[in-house]
Swiss-Prot record:
Gene Ontology cellular-component annotations: cytoplasm
Protein name as catalogued: Leucyl/phenylalanyl-tRNA--protein transferase
A molecular function (GO) term: leucyl-tRNA--protein transferase activity
Protein's UniProt keywords contain Coiled coil: no
EC annotation from Swiss-Prot or TrEMBL: 2.3.2.6
Underlying gene: aat
Catalytic activity as recorded in UniProt: N-terminal L-lysyl-[protein] + L-leucyl-tRNA(Leu) = N-terminal L-leucyl-L-lysyl-[protein] + tRNA(Leu) + H(+); N-terminal L-arginyl-[protein] + L-leucyl-tRNA(Leu) = N-terminal L-leucyl-L-arginyl-[protein] + tRNA(Leu) + H(+); L-phenylalanyl-tRNA(Phe) + an N-terminal L-alpha-aminoacyl-[protein] = an N-terminal L-phenylalanyl-L-alpha-aminoacyl-[protein] + tRNA(Phe)
Biological processes per GO annotation: protein catabolic process
Length: 233
């Protein structure tokens, strides 16, 4: 029988095969959200996910929800929306506002707690966490954020205040990642919304194999400089 690992401040994460099957992928509890631990977790295919008032819970589910960038195809309806809309798009221009909106739209029971906001804000400040923003004039109407681990982007959350704005942010993300030769987006846990966007389940072992190959392949600094971008069709 597998037992749950309780982390102290300096403990390392256990191997992925020691994760529980019920609940799927729970591998450890406790520890902290310091940047060093978070980056170590993502480099091992582990991420934090817990509600306000709970201890820190760490997960590595099997299977993993992923987007293979070579397989991504935007829907016709999204492309029509993009040609019709007057949105503008930026990268890393409003990280704090994006994560705030991602938390606000979930209201009660959000897992984007003040501790998560602070931790990922630190990762952003040191160049590891990134945001995509969609604007209508000067109003932020959609976006997403996540962590770059080598040539894998680990998506965390997205939001929209206008129809399809989060899908537009995702489309921009894919376009940008392809430009810099990323091959995979980690979406963590399958759900119907991700499936509609094109996510597929990937066995954990296969995901970890890809992660091991891609996590040391770094992008140029220009990839994540704050910038306004044009969305090609």
């Amino acid at each position: 029988m597998k037992s749950l690992c309780y982390l102290n401040q300096e403990d390392c994460f256990p191997a992925a095969h020691k994760a529980l099957t019920d609940p799927n992928g729970l591998i450890a509890i406790g520890g902290d959200l310091q940047p060093e631990r978070l980056l170590s977790a993502y480099q091992q295919g582990i991420f934090p996910w817990f509600n306000q008032g709970e201890p820190i819970l760490w997960w590595t589910p099997d299977p993993r929800a992923v987007f293979q960038l070579s397989d991504y195809r935007p829907s016709r309806s999204l492309m029509k929306t993009l040609k019709r809309q007057t949105w503008r798009f930026t990268i890393n221009k409003a990280f704090d506002a994006v994560i705030h909106q991602c938390a606000a739209l979930r209201q009660e029971g959000t897992w984007i707690t003040p501790a998560i906001k602070a931790a990922y804000g630190q990762l952003h400040a040191q160049g590891d966490a990134h945001s995509i923003e969609v604007w209508q004039g000067e109003q932020l109407v959609g976006g997403l954020y996540g962590i770059a681990v080598g040539k894998i982007f680990c998506g965390e959350s997205m939001f929209h205040l206008e129809t399809d704005a989060s899908k537009a942010a995702f489309h921009l993300l894919v376009t940008h990642l392809r430009r810099f030769e990323f091959t995979l987006i980690d979406a963590q846990v399958m759900n119907p919304h991700l499936a509609r966007l094109g996510a597929k389940p990937l066995p954990r072992e296969a995901f970890l194999t890809q992660l091991a190959q891609l996590k040391h392949q770094h992008s140029p600094a220009t990839a994540w400089q704050p910038q306004e971008v044009k969305l090609g069709y």
